[in-house]
Amino acid sequence: SKQISDRVDGMLVLPPVTVGYSGHYDSFPFSLTLSYDTTTQVIYDLIESVIRNGITHIFLMNGHDGNIAPIEIASRKIKEKYPEVQIAALTQWWVAAGNLLPKDTFEVWNGLGHAGEGETSIAYYLFPEWCEPELATCVIPSLPDEIDIKWDFSELTDTAQTGDATKASAEKGKK
């Protein structure tokens, strides 16, 4: 966001919302979550606060799968109440990144996963001191592309990680 705002005159970047809906991770220790209703309301209230300050072009960037539905609902409600406001959202940056980067950037599952190849590569690039590559694992769940199956994360993995973090690199993260 900071790099983009440096190139776009007049762009305001707000601090990230660091807690949202994570109920599907509740089977793992220390998973913090807000309800769907609370998450939706927080997003709605923040957008409405920005609108009250005269901002009419809003772009939301999401970094967490649990917030996709709340962002969709909040932004739709905002558009209904404030039809003059232009609002757009990138609700799944991880899918967009895998699709926009050269096809050979990621080796497994198009870089997808929770702490998978893509996210871990970004961490290796931005925060190498926080990373422990020796703990990287590979868990590729068998999920259909055509249907959105609802699952608890513990049904997919026993580590809270999916994708192939063993293929991650700082070079991929820089891209």
Regions found by a protein language model. Name each.
Residues S1-F59, G63-K175:
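Extended, histidine- and acidic-residue-enriched regions that form the cofactor-binding/catalytic faces
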